[in-house]
Amino acid sequence: RDFCLSRGLGDVYKRQAQDSISFKSIRPKPKKKDSITLTSRDYKRISIFRDTTAVDTTLTLRAMYRQNPIRRDMFAYVPFQNMGQTYTSLAYDYRSVGISPDFGMRGNRFYFSQAQQIPYFYLPTPMIEFSFKSGISQGQMLQSFFSANLTPEFNLFIRYNALRSLGDYKNILSSVGSFSAGFSYYSKNKKYLAMAHYANEEVNRQENGGLLYPEQFGQGDDQFRNRARLDVALSGVNSEENLKRYFLQHQYNFLPASHREGGSEILLKHQVEYQSRNYYHSQSEMASNGVLGQSFTLKSLRDKHSLRELTNRLGAELSLPYLGKTFLYGKSYFYNYFAKGIFVDNNGNFIPHQIKNTDYGIGVQWKKNYKGFAINAQGEQMILGKLLGTEIAGDLSYTFDEKNKVIAGVNVTSKMPNFNFLLYQSDYKNYNWYHLDDFSKENIQTIYGSAYTQWGNLSLDITNINNYTYFQLQPASSGEKNQSKPAQYTGNIQYLKLVGEREFLLGKWGLENTLMYQQVLQDNANVFNVPSLTTRNTLYFTTFMFKKAMFLQTGLTFKYFTNYYAYEYNPLLADFQVQTQEKIGNYSVTDFFLNAKVRTMRIFFTVEHLEALLGKYNYYAAPNQPYRDWKVRLGIIWYFFK
């Protein structure tokens, strides 16, 4: 799991100054005493867990950090050179794991959503959102969204995102597209609630395998300032992954409104999700340099792996004022992961091409709020099937006031590794395996705590991992050069992550600081690697201009992480592999930004990576994958409210 930076409660209070002017310029001044004034806080975003937040139209550092194709804070990530490529993760989050194996191909996961990440809305008027960002060399990103409440009970939404970027290096053209549409309905008598959506998402990009001769980049010769002249490992290689999902969650409340005073409810809940995923690796010409080893064919190849999943969850929830909410449910999980056909290895052994079954399980969830305390606990156990799995999780939080909150929790999970660790088939000879019978479950135990205060935020995670599963790059001396094999580390890995945030304000100036310290104990195995120190510091100035018609924000952002054995990207697997030959890191990235907000439009102007102008070419996103040179980027997010 990737690290997700939680900024806590602070941004809520920063937004209030801007919220009051959010709609001034797009609405006529009220002429009647009974007219209603709306702000962005009246436009609600709702999760499938019924958590509600306001649509954010303010200009904050958080908005700038998330102005990228995957809408995430980039503190714990290093992007590859081109938009649409993958990201190196600098930290990991095990607070919520899940008990089902993932598809794999983790290099593409950033561009695919999960059902719980799709938001629903309650809007007093229709809303449109456009987001734009210039690409690398040629291309751009455009994200568009429309939502409206046709009635107070029924909301629908449509979202389309597209990205196409050429990149500076050869053979890294990227194209990403996603479409989603859905609705939510809450009956007038508040007895029936439904949320549903359809998603169709795709990633298609060329793969160049990284630099063939890294010294061409590091020496800084003038002839290689044009990055398209650098030699790359692969040509004619394309990877593609697509996802389609149908999702419905609905519930019925048996108690009439007159019996629901005090929070009493008896609910029947049902959730169904069908998802199909396909991954293709195609190659029109075989690499003569043996980057991926020997193949069964000298002509073109096209590997394919697919996953079909159908998950059903049905249960009943009892809510009582003094007992909280208790939800008991049964679950079925159908899965069919398959490759193109039965394979016979060099020893004459048959390798199955499919992992298919239906697993059954039970689960319970309990929530209770009492005088500032909030308790959340859940457990799930798959009891019949092949993959099985167990998860027990809980957290306790206490809210002192609007600006101060603490939370502590635990998560214990046992699950099978991702499907591409268990089964993979390829026309490359050394990329064929089946490990369903000999790989053990990964066992993960995490305890964590966070404090969100008016002075700053602090979080601590301590994780123990047993049977950690990874791809291991084989050394040249083994005779299997450039082969990546799945393996399990049967020892224990202890992983500590400590993150602190503090902001200092003086008049119109601000200095925001985020510092992350990490330590891993693994008996010198070097299979789980992260930088020990990562820091980001942003010095900025803010002011209103033109009689408060525009809000201006400008400054510098500095980021640095210590060197470590970063995972290497494997273009055949679309995944990352462990290597211990090359460290990356120990370089800084400074960006200049000039941002502005006019009405409900936010403009982001950035000059990225100023250090690249100094001519020291030691900046890598992953082994053999350089980070970006200095770039001038433009981004826009624009909301329209009728």
Describe the function of each predicted region.
Residues 8-10, 167, 635:
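Glycine-centered flexibility sites
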Residues 123-125, 240-285, 299-642:
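Exposed, low-structure sequence patches enriched in small/polar residues
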